[in-house]
Amino acid sequence: MYNDIKLEKGLYNLSGKSFTSALEELDPSAAYVGTELAALDAYERQLKRYNIRVSGTECDMVEKFFASTETAVLFPEFVSRCIKKGFDDTVLKAVTAVRTVSESSQYLGCVLDDSTAYGTTAQTVALPASTVTEGTTAVALEKIGRLINASYEAIRKQRLDVFGVMLRSIGIKLANTVVGKAVTALKADAAGVTTSSLSYSDLADLYGKFDNFNMTTVLASPAIAAKIAAMDQMKDARAKADGKMFLPFGSELVKSAAVDDATVIGLDRDFALEFITSTGLVLETDKLIDRQLDQITVSVTCGFRKVTPDAVKVLTITS
């Protein structure tokens, strides 16, 4: 049971396992089906065990994690989850079709040669072929990270939910930097249209360039997204409860500072882009456990590759 687990630093260093995965092996969630703890994962059960409240009106201070050597072991996972939540709550999920974990810093994906026309075939004629081969150009994975400086004395009396907001903001900005790499990959050799001044008809023209795929997403800079939102054709558009806005033809309008003001990217999020990582978010856990918060690094090593070039089109604004 969760009350009997011995928490120690080594749980962060098991090969191929996250801290939560290691806890789940010791305290499987399957054992709690039908109980009041069924909604909690193994890490959350440890927070309950030590009565550490990370949100709500009775939220604890950061120092609650350091009440004992065992509770201190839980602190890096709290930091990691907050940063990861910020990282995941970004436009990355709006532009990524698939996520791949690579064991190497160089990644060679597969390439589909699908250029032969589709159509009817006579009985005596060979079927047109689609060929999948290994790519010839490797994607180099690069590290993107941040150094977090904080003293224990500065944050020990800070509420965990407030500190968590700060960490999530770091995760968001880290992810937005990663999105810059995604934009570069999407734009590379992409077909599209050109206009001297952005109008709704240009967006409709971009939409019409998609034949086999759907333009599920329109990615634009904040300034261009604002211009699109102000167009007369958008006056009846309504943002959903989650803040998402859609163009009349169904494409989600997504803004990102990683896109320049001369570019609008249309894509089918289900086919366009592969997000490749060699690791998840990497955090220096030992220092956090030992209250050495003055130089904590968080990073992700990643790259992007277009899976289906036809699922991406670009509108270029020349003025």
Task: Identify the function of each model-found stretch.
Residues 118-120, 158-159, 227-229, 306-307:
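Short helix/loop capping segments that flank catalytic or ligand/cofactor-binding pockets
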